């Protein structure tokens, strides 16, 4: 019996898992555990070129078979029966060396993304805290300082978005172990003005509150970054938050779709972003998010060499007939576009 057949065998026990009960149905039996040696043999059986068994086994031990599945998926043969998906077998020319290089590229890409998002998050925190703080030191707690739709419309569960946001903030404060939080608890009873408590916010809290700002406040902050109004920046922050979460959890980033395509101003007013309008794929994949980061960093950190480091990283991508940066949304000669010069 081949390893592929062994892998599909059902466990001897057909008892339903006690912790994860499933409804009745015609389910495929769960796959069985394979040793690292069996995993290596299975990859070979499916046609993957492996230059060094020792190196491949070490990578499986270090990274895990299932974690690497997403990286070798594009190298598998496409189905020919009209059904979406791919076969288990690898395409001609697929190699474990390319998979390792792709994984390393994605790892470095995640680090670059987190570097950019840190700068952007800190800058937008200051924007929000400074603008709202002038209005009231507890503006984040006062519905009259925020948008009426954010504070008044129900989410469908009897609570407003503002209520949900406030509960998440309270939980973040309760779990915080920062010295400044302890200081405010002991000296001021725990209540913190916006310019203090905003340091507890994660990117998700920041993004959601920005969406809940009054239109005039959103626009004032957005215009600092060369955007016509706040709907664009709100959309960008949501896309950045998704990418930040993927990167922070060490998940595959390079060819993943963003759940919400970010809004881009018309090319008549923002020619530097015009090439994003030429192909929807560019905005759905990480390239579009990288363009948003570059645009914001030109204001936040104009002397930063982040874009040059991205260009250098792109040179390490294992391009071949099966793998291209186009799958991440990158157009040909992207580095020559006005945005990247």
Q: For the regions a protein language model found, what residue spans apply to each?
A:
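Long, contiguous internal "core" modules enriched in hydrophobic/ aromatic residues
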Residues: 3-341
């Amino acid at each position: 019996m081949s390893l592929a057949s062994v892998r599909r065998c059902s466990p001897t026990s057909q008892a339903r898992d006690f912790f994860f009960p499933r409804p009745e149905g015609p389910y495929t039996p769960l796959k069985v555990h394979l040793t690292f040696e069996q995993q290596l043999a299975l990859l070979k059986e499916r046609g993957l070129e492996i230059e060094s068994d020792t190196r491949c086994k070490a990578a499986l031990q270090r990274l895990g078979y299932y974690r690497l599945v997403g990286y070798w998926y594009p190298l598998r043969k496409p189905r020919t029966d009209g059904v979406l998906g791919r076969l288990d077998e690898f395409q001609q020319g697929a190699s474990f060396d390319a998979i390792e290089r792709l994984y390393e590229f994605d790892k470095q890409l995640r680090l670059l993304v987190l570097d950019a998002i840190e700068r952007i998050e800190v800058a937008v925190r200051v924007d929000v805290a400074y603008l709202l703080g002038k209005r009231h030191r507890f503006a984040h707690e006062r519905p009259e300082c925020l948008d009426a739709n954010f504070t008044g419309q129900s989410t469908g569960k009897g609570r407003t978005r503002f209520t949900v946001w406030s509960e998440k903030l309270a939980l973040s404060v309760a779990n915080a172990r920062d010295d400044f939080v302890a200081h405010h608890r002991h000296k001021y009873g725990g209540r913190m003005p916006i310019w203090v408590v905003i340091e507890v916010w994660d990117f998700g809290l920041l993004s959601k509150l920005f969406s809940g700002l009054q239109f005039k406040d959103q626009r004032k902050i957005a215009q600092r970054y060369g955007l016509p109004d706040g709907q664009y920046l709100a959309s960008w922050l949501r896309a950045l938050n998704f990418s930040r979460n993927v990167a922070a959890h060490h998940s595959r980033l390079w060819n993943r779709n963003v759940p919400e395509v970010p809004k881009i101003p018309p090319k008549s007013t923002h020619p530097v972003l015009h090439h994003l309008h030429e192909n929807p794929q560019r905005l759905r994949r990480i390239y579009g998010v990288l363009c948003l980061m570059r645009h914001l960093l030109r204001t936040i950190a104009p002397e930063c060499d982040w874009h040059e480091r991205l260009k250098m990283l792109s040179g390490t991508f294992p391009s071949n007939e099966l793998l291209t940066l186009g799958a991440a949304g990158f157009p040909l000669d992207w580095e020559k576009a006005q945005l990247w010069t």
